Amino acid sequence: IRDRQCPAPEAIRAIAVDTTASTPCLVDRTCTPLSLTAGYEENPDAMFVLWKDHTAQRESEEITALCARGEINYARRSGNHYSSECFWSKVLHLLRGSERLRRDAWAVVELCDWIPAVLTGCRAMEDLRSGLCAAGSKVMWAEEWGGYPPEEFFAGLDPVLLPILRRLPVRTYGCDTPAGTLSPEWAAKLGLSEQVVIGVGNVDCHSGAVGAGICHGTVVLNLGTSACYMAVMPPEKMGDRMVEGIFGQVDGSILPGMVGFEAGMSAFGDVYAWFKRLLCWPLREVLLPVSYTHLRAHETCADL
């Protein structure tokens, strides 16, 4: 696969990526994941944390409680609840668990922001273009409170988060915005032109909604490991209303110029996989071992 070349590289004008979210990773000053640096190769906490990791439940509850006590509820755009699947829950859990990680982590990057950074040759957080869809739905970014919640909020939660907050890009960009062009290094690797435009990263389900032709008056369901239900609404029809129970209500997400809504079930395909394993337990643990033993006995007799 590494040796394959595009038969018509001149036909490729742009590349855009979407990933699961929140899928954050601790990085060094050059935006390199710590897992790609010496001494962290086998440390799972230095790798990207998969979106469906729910280890940070305690941190999720702390953040939700702090939001509820504040003058501004910074979880109001996620149904007044901040999930353990989301950015700050995971980052807080990682940093609390390791003094070494706290020392070596310069910043934290979402996977959907990191891949465009790699492709464009971005090596500094101040140059990174942060995608609105992930920042708004997973990282508590909102224009109404000037970006991310203020330092006072995070200081009240745990001061360990303050250096990470200060290094996050303040501005966010929609998925219709270029992040840059293909770097010389990656142009050579891929056999493509350096003029290929790299799009700002997006959340996977949001891209699926766009691909399905989402528009005002429709609902799109993305069914897989999870089940995500999405809709969009013109902002003039919404006003200041917040929809209770929506996982993410973000101005400008999914479709630029619209209010994007995201909700659903964290476990969908995973539940079916669990149910299959449950039903198949007798086959795996009883029938198959017996059949295997019976087969081996026949083979042994034949050998004798």
Residue ranges and their predicted role:
Residues 27, 64-202:
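Gly/Ser/Thr-rich active-site cleft segment
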Residues 47-93, 97, 141-147, 250-292:
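Glycine-rich phosphate-binding loop plus the immediately following alpha-helix
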